[in-house]
Amino acid sequence: MIAAALVALALAQPHIVWKPILFGPQRRAETAAYAERHYGLHTWRLAHPHVIVEHYTANDSFSATWNTFASDAPDPELHERPGDCAHFVIDRDGTIYQLVPVTTMCRHTVGLNWTAIGIEDVGTSDASILDNPRQLAASLRLTLWLMSRLHISLPNVIGHSESLTSPYHRERYAAWRCQTHGDWQHADMVVYRRKLLALALAQRVGISRSGHTVASHC
């Protein structure tokens, strides 16, 4: 009965500032073509996300991050579009910005874009976010709200560096099958997930702890 009661409670949406990048017909077509090449899915839509990926921006500026994502610049290796983007960016002062709807696929994590929500924390290291109380609180609150809303389990909240061990990872382009990034290392995500769980318990929000990782063959 207690567990059922906890699951029934919903976390209120945190304050989110809508700051959209242009994601019109051209970028949608680019995204669908990208998804076809890399995942075998011809769609720009993010229908049923299973994963939330935490990133940091490697800069100290929301505006610079927004401009990068809005530019739709091709990647330097394959020179393909769409450019990088994330669904949410959290500034140093804790302001949460949303750039695209959660129903739109964003290019932020090789192998997982087809099923992942991307959250970028403005900063230059994991520690720069973990040591910033306002930003960390906003990041945890947003992530927990998304977990509750989209029914994403705690083990499927990952750092970018953990992408290769996600059971949802898939990549058709062979040269990218082992590609990942260094943001949000596993040890720091252990801390982050522990804080997420503590917040869920404090807010009496039921979340699933089921899930698993897979061995990386890279």
Predicted regions and their residues:
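Short strand-loop junctions, especially beta-strand C-caps/beta-turns
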Residues: 57, 122-124
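Short coil-to-beta-strand
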Residues: 110-121
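Structural preference for beta-strand elements that scaffold enzyme active sites
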Residues: 51, 116-118, 156
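Basic/polar, cationic surfaces and motifs that engage anionic cell-wall
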Residues: 11-28, 46, 125-218
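N-terminal catalytic cores of peptidoglycan-degrading enzymes
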Residues: 6-109
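Bacterial N-terminal signal peptides that target proteins for export
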Residues: 1-2
